[in-house]
């Protein structure tokens, strides 16, 4: 029953975002739209931003289910684009009403989860420090999120598949190469530029 109520609150928020900006939506608005009292809202979420964060995490979990490997990262990234596009009014409203920072935080979490799986898989059999693996995942995270924020900024125009294909051409094989350069079980070579 708890998940059902949370999903109903999420849907009410998304319905209201079609009518007005996030900063003008109140908990009473959401509760009224959902047909519950305000205290029920507070039983599940501390505020509207907590609901926004939960909604983003739920969408992320659905988007990335089973797509955190080197062979499927493109599908995972495409699923992220599709999840963002499917929630365009929600994302655009949060992007313009609250702050770009909240959208960035959502996207950073989403893409890091995807990339962490890819880096771990590619690091199999290599002796690479955890902080170096995290650094590599973060570098790619910033590239991915930068591309996506640019796409959002331009009203989600452009084909996500084309963006992903171009990105793949740039970074293909580079995760394994970066991990190899960070190996602690072999001497460092001159990485060049």
Task: Describe the function of each predicted region.
Residues 2, 6, 56, 104-108, ...:
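Amphipathic, non-transmembrane alpha-helical scaffold segments
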Residues 100-125, 131-146, 176:
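Amphipathic alpha-helical packing segments from all-alpha helical-bundle domains
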Residues 19-20, 127, 193:
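Cytosolic nucleotide-binding catalytic cores of signal-transduction proteins
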Residues 40, 90:
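Residues in the helix-turn-helix
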